[in-house]
Amino acid sequence: MNKLSSHVLVGENQETNFIYLMNIYTGCSVKVSRRIFKDVESIENNDEIMAFLDSEGFCKNTANLIQEVYDEESKQLNITFLIHENCNFRCTYCYEKFEKNAMEREVIDGVINYIAKRIQDDSRLEHVHLAWFGGEPLLNLKGIEYISENVIRLCEISNLSYSSDITTNGFLLNRRIYEKLTKLQVTNYQITIDGNQEHHDSQRVLKNGKGTYQRIIDNLLDISKNTKDSNLIALRTNVAPDNFESMPKHITKLISLFGEDERFDLNFHNVGNWGDKCIDIIKNNVALELSELTVSLGGKSEGILWNLMPNSYCYAGKKNNFVIGSDGMVYKCTVLLYDERNHIGNLENGKLKIDDKKESLWVADKMTDRCFSCPIGTACLNKKCPALLLSKKVENCLYNHEELNRMLKLMDQQNLFTYTVA
């Protein structure tokens, strides 16, 4: 008789009387009414529903799935470009030193040549993903255009799929540039708005100290009102003790501005000690709490649910993921830019010269025995943050049943379950 695999996350909603089943490996999710099945045991004792769940991968052996995760990882090449390492902002909590500028043309051509060679030589490769980061990437829009056009062409010739995302402060993201990026298949955008205008303008300022809030909001309103596409625009808020109390008003404001546009999603992150600056931080993770508040107010907040998605462990822990600096330095992580352990190599003449020992610090198998019985093991692989494990030697496990159950409820509230049995 089939049993649910250990990689299936089980939750419940006592208020609505539903059982939740989430297949972390495939992303398939099922909500089951307790009027039909009172508990998981009664589900497992029913041949009909178990046959259905088995067909959706809910009964697979977890140990075999781990290898499948790594096999899937080998089919993708992910490159993050520090396309411009300077910035037009000087955020108070930023960890970057802004010692470099636009990516050199020699480096740009070298990366394109590297990608072309990988596509030619690696028969396993099925997908190429490019991420634009900085500094502020839109300070080098021409570089983004040139690389995108060339790599898209390479993928089309070889029949590979392609995708792209950008992390930008939003100040330069007017409608014209947004439409240009969309044509270049940039489909995911992350823009930070740190609370209300007063708070945002106290810490996310231009080089000259002037505020940036209204310009960003105006850009996004223009995009919302005058463009139509299926992109995702994540509005990120960094939360600290000095802006936490103002979050309800901030969230309400963003919902009033963008709540009717399905492309916009509100994300929340605790401000972290990313550099050597003394910054007050909130010790408790408030991201889930604020996501719940957003949904209760009628907004959309799906970003936090990434923790439940397949292959959602950190890019830095993936073998086929590289961060390329503007001068050709190769990193694994975009945060520990000044840590020698993160300087894993250099781009030379269209080839990545990688220090295998340094790279292994990030990509080596870090799973423990209990990872194999953990419901989110196939998504996490104990690599949710390799930098944390590397720097602080702390346990990297993120399993918290109460929080995961709240995430399942958040999925339900946003009608994100794949199937309903009621």
Regions found by a protein language model. Name each.
Residues 198-319, 323-327:
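Radical SAM enzyme [4Fe-4S]-AdoMet core and its adjacent flexible, acidic
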Residues 43-59, 318-353:
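A broadly conserved sequence feature marking short terminus-proximal activation segments
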Residues 178, 186-197, 263-270:
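Non-cysteine beta-strand/loop elements that form the S-adenosyl-L-methionine
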Residues 4-5, 337-422:
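Flexible mid-to-C-terminal extensions adjoining Fe-S/redox cofactors in radical SAM and related proteins
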Residues 300-338, 367-387:
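C-terminal accessory regions of radical SAM enzymes
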Residues 26, 97-101, 202-210, 391:
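Short glycine-enriched, charge-decorated loop/helix-capping segments at active-site entrances
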Residues 3-31, 45-80, 123:
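N-terminal [4Fe-4S]-dependent radical SAM core
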Residues 65-179, 187:
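Conserved alpha-helical substructure of the radical SAM core
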